[in-house]
Each structure stands twice: as C-alpha cells, then as structure tokens.
C-alpha cells in the first residue's frame, strides 16, 4: 500500500497559510545559491512556486564561492529576512561545515547549522532538518513509534544521523538501528524491523525480500535514472508493506515543512 503523503503535505501547507495570515506581515525566505547542480536549481524553482502559493516572499541570491559565508552572515542581521536556505550540494572544494555554521541559527529553517543539529542530542528541536522531520511526521501519522524497531539505512548528517536522534527522542521512544555501506547482513536487520527508512541514494536499493510483511517503509531517495525520478525502494515492496511513493512522498512533506519553519521563525522574530 502506498502512504498518502500528499494529504500530509497539504495539511501542513494549509496551517502554514493560516499562520501567515495571522502574522500581520509577509514573512520572507532567502535561498542562497552557489551551484549549477540541476536538482538544486529545480528545488529552488519549486520553492518559488510554493512560496507564492503560501503568501511568503522569496528571493534567490546567486553568489560566488568567495561571497557565500559573508552573505549568510549579513542575512543574519537583515530584519526583512526570516528564513535562510542554502542550496546544496556544494562543489567539493567547499568547507561545508564552515558554510553551514554561517547560516544564522534563528533563521536556519532547514536545520543545517551544527548548532541546531547539536540540539537534537538534547531532545530539542527548534529547526530539525526538514527531511528527517518529514520522515518523523509521516511515521507519526501511520503508527505509534514507541518501542518500534526502526532501521535507518544511511548515516549522513543531512538525513540518517539526525533522523536516528529524532526517533530516539524521549516520548517517541523508537528503538533505532543505523546502517551504512559497511553494515554486515543488512537484509537480516531490515527484515526484522517494523519500520525501515532508506536514505542511500541508489535506485530501487531496498527489495521486497529485505522487508517484513506489514512493515512501514519510508523512501527518502531521489535518483534520476534515464531522466526519470526513482526512489531507493523497489516498487514491489509496496505489495507487502506501507511505502511512501517517489515522487510525491517525503520530498513534498520536506518542502511543506521548510515553509512551516519560515513562519515559525517569523513568529519568533516578531516576539
Ligand atoms: P549520502 O550520500 O550523504 O549518504 C548515503 C548513505 O547511504 C551513507 O551513509 C552510505 O554509507 C549509505 N550507503 C551507501 N551504499 C550503501 C549500501 N550498499 N548499503 C547500506 N548503506 C549504504 O546521501 P544523503 O543522506 O544526503 O541522501 C540519501 C538520498 O536521499 C539521496 O538519494 C538524496 O538525493 C535523497 N535526499 C532526499 C531528500 C528529500 O527531501 N526527499 C533530502 C535529502 C536527500 P557510508 O556512510 O558508509 O558511505
């Protein structure tokens, strides 16, 4: 069975729109870009569309590699800006940690600044990373996480690690296993899990024989194969498990949450 993520994304967006109307001013998101990566550019395009729909002002700043850190720092003191997003991936020569540390913490709507990520260790979530939060929101709609055996495949700073911490959070109380490319007997681990989240970046990586019947599977993957978007989960898994689709799954909820965070940042800054 496919999990209906569209409805989840729409309901987040509806609440965001209502909150924008109550704010009394137009909140603003600025996306800083120093990339010609096609998927990053297409994400910026979809941000523009979504911002228009939600009544949020949106600007893209195209900057040179030398300008990126200073631009981010300046945006911190610009009172007309409520949220700051940085387009990734960065070219290999970039110091990712330095750049992300320069995203103003209180405007870090994507939750990428190490200061925001660090709060997850304390079970605090001011701006959790949007994709990890999307996975959690979807899971909480589908099940009670307490005591569930969850396997997260992928240990990136963007998705896998923060997600594992968020699932472990007191109150959510999942039992979490994190797997990666050196994991031995991955199939045995995923097959014994109530929930599997796949954030690997390989098309159709998780096969039906790796999943327990009745499990919930969250597909984070974005892979372009012959120009077609495919997830990390083989479509046949849907025959035995509840699976988020790609496209139309985690990605939609992720974008909806980014804008929810912009409004939350604006509400805080107004106070
Ligand atoms: P990374 O490349 O940073 O991480 C991939 C992870 O997968 C690594 O931890 C790697 O292990 C692990 N891995 C690779 N091969 C295997 C294997 N054979 N068995 C088990 N684990 C393996 O990717 P991201 O986390 O940034 O992204 C993952 C996917 O999610 C990508 O397709 C990306 O495009 C997508 N994505 C989607 C988003 C959305 O909103 N829907 C947002 C962000 C990402 P190791 O650490 O050992 O190398």
Swiss-Prot record:
EC annotation from Swiss-Prot or TrEMBL: 1.5.1.5, 3.5.4.9
Gene Ontology cellular component annotations, sorted alphabetically: cytosol
UniProt GO BP: L-histidine biosynthetic process; methionine biosynthetic process; purine nucleotide biosynthetic process; tetrahydrofolate interconversion
Catalytic reaction annotation: (6R)-5,10-methylene-5,6,7,8-tetrahydrofolate + NADP(+) = (6R)-5,10-methenyltetrahydrofolate + NADPH; (6R)-5,10-methenyltetrahydrofolate + H2O = (6R)-10-formyltetrahydrofolate + H(+)
Pathway assignment: One-carbon metabolism; tetrahydrofolate interconversion
Keywords: Amino-acid biosynthesis, Histidine biosynthesis, Hydrolase, Methionine biosynthesis, Multifunctional enzyme, NADP, One-carbon metabolism, Oxidoreductase, Purine biosynthesis
Entry keyword annotation includes Hydrolase: yes
InterPro entries per UniProt: Aminoacid_DH-like_N_sf, NAD(P)-bd_dom_sf, THF_DH/CycHdrlase, THF_DH/CycHdrlase_cat_dom, THF_DH/CycHdrlase_NAD-bd_dom
Gene Ontology MF terms in the entry: methenyltetrahydrofolate cyclohydrolase activity; methylenetetrahydrofolate dehydrogenase (NADP+) activity
Family annotation (CDD domains): NAD_bind_m-THF_DH_Cyclohyd
Record-linked Gene3D superfamilies: Leucine Dehydrogenase, chain A, domain 1, NAD(P)-binding Rossmann-like Domain
Binding site for NADP(+): 154-156, 181, 222
Function: Catalyzes the oxidation of 5,10-methylenetetrahydrofolate to 5,10-methenyltetrahydrofolate and then the hydrolysis of 5,10-methenyltetrahydrofolate to 10-formyltetrahydrofolate.
HAMAP family noted in UniProt: THF_DHG_CYH
Quaternary structure and interacting proteins, as annotated: Homodimer.
Family, as annotated: Belongs to the tetrahydrofolate dehydrogenase/cyclohydrolase family.
Protein's recorded name: Bifunctional protein FolD
């Amino acid at each position: 069975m496919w999990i209906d993520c569209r409805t989840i994304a729409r309901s987040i967006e509806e609440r965001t729109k209502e909150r924008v109307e109550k704010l009394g001013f137009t909140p603003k998101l600025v996306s800083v870009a120093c990339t010609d990566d096609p998927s990053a550019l297409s994400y910026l395009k979809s941000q523009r569309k979504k911002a228009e729909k939600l009544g949020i002002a949106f600007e893209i700043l195209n900057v040179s590699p030398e300008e990126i850190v200073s631009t981010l720092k300046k945006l911190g003191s610009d009172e007309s800006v409520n949220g700051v997003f940085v387009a990734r991936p960065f070219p290999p020569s970039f110091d990712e940690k330095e750049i992300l540390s320069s995203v103003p913490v209180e405007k870090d709507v994507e939750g990428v600044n190490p200061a925001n990520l660090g709060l997850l260790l304390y079970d605090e979530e001011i701006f959790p990373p949007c994709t990890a939060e999307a996975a959690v929101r979807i899971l909480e709609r589908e099940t009670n996480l307490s005591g569930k055996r969850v396997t997260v495949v992928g240990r990136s700073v963007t998705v896998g690690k923060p997600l594992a911490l968020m699932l472990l959070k007191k109150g959510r109380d999942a039992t979490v296993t994190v797997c990666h490319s050196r994991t031995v007997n991955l199939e045995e681990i995923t097959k014994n899990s109530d929930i599997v989240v796949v954030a690997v970046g390989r098309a159709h990586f998780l096969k039906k024989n790796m999943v327990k019947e009745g499990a919930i599977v969250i597909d984070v993957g974005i892979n372009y194969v012959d120009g077609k978007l495919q997830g990390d989960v083989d479509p046949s898994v849907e025959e035995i498990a509840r699976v988020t689709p790609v496209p139309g799954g985690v990605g939609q909820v992720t974008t909806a949450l980014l804008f929810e965070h912009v409004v939350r940042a604006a509400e805080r800054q107004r106070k």
